[in-house]
Structure formats: C-alpha cells, structure tokens
Amino acid sequence: MSSSTVEEVEVRGRLRKRRADAGSVRLSERDGQLLRLIGEQYAITVDQLARLIGRTPRTGRWLRDRWRRAGWVESRQLTAAGPSFLWLTRAGTRVAGSPFRTWRPNAALASHIEAVTEVRLLSEQHGLGLWVCERALAKSLCFATPVRAHLPDAVIATGDGRIAVEVELTLKSRARLEALLLELGRDYDRVWYFAVPSLVPRLRELAAALPWQNIAVHPYPPRAAALIA
C-alpha cells in the first residue's frame, strides 16, 4: 500500500471517528464537581449556577443547555413567577457519581431549596467551613441512630465545632419553633438561623429564653458581614 493510500485511510478513519463523536458532550472534572453539588442541594437556579462558576447569567444558561443536551439535567420554572431551576436526571446522577437519589421536582420546596443554596454560596465564597448538606446528614444519621432527630438544612464544620444552618421562610407555630431551637441549640456548637424579616423578632425572643446562648438569628437574605463578624 502506497504512503498516499495509507494517509487517505487514516484521514477517513479520523473523519468517521469525528462523525461518531459529533454532538456528544464529554464530562469534565469541573462538570462532575458542579453536578455533584446540584445533587447535594436537590436543585439550583440558573443564576446560582452562573455565580458558582463566576460567569454571567448568559454563560450559566449556556452551561445548563450543554448539560441538558447531554441528558444530565432537566430545567424549568417550578413556580409561575419563580426562576428556572435545574436538577439531575438519572443519567446525570450516574455520571456525576452522586450518592443521592434522583430528585423529583417539587414546587412547594423550590423557594426553600433556593434559599439554602444562597446560604451555601455565601459560606463557600468566604471560606466559613466545610458544608455538609442535609442529604448527607440524613444518610449518616439513618445508620447512627434509630431515633430520627430533626435535621438542619445543613451543617458547617469548622475548626471550632459544628454550626447548624436553618432557613425559615414560612410561619410555624410558636411551640414548633421553640422545639426546633431547643433541639438544635442542644445538639450543635452553634446555630445560624436565617429567617424572613417578619419572623426574626419572634425567633430572637425564643432563642434568648433558651438555657444556652449559641443561637444567632439572621434576616434572610444572608449577609456576609453578619456571619464574618
């Protein structure tokens, strides 16, 4: 076989391989990290994705669309006036190596999920500690004890101990709030409670009456200055 014929065969082979790969999306290390984080949070908004990668909302939408073409995520609004969320498909859960079950969209939880992720973004932006998501806490506790304790929305592990993170967007009964604060204050070194402004006075009053003074109530949305001080 002449050298020119060999070259033609090699070129045709490369073209066939290129056509076979055309349109496919390859998983990068960064893709895997971001997809696993989405699995930890149940879902995130497209705007939150953009901030995670330090890019514009347009780039966040581009990345979301890339993952959607690959079949790794689904994305849509979960409430009529709310933002677009994205969450892992079964294929996305598999390629990311996420240890959690594939989440089924739940409009009733959308605002709370978004709010918890806002706190996580702020915590990680300022290096406040290692974020342990609610899903990981549930996995560890189900093996540790037969008694189901209240799970905070997350725990931030620091050199000084564990900080329970709780986000409250809706009104609960006084008895329920008091029970939550009592349990969290007892079980964790510190508690950061983020609540919509209308709930802050009641929560601060309840926290002040507890036997331990390790609960800080912050208005939501979270502000870095209040946490770093």
Placement of each model-derived feature along the sequence:
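Nuclease-adjacent, charged terminal/linker segments that flank catalytic cores
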Residues: 1-103
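Catalytic cores of nucleic-acid endonucleases
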Residues: 162, 169-214
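Structural motif
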Residues: 42, 71, 127, 188-189
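A short, highly charged nucleic-acid-interacting micro-segment common to nuclease
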Residues: 100-116
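Short, solvent-exposed loop/turn segments at secondary-structure junctions
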Residues: 41-44, 137-139, 170, 199
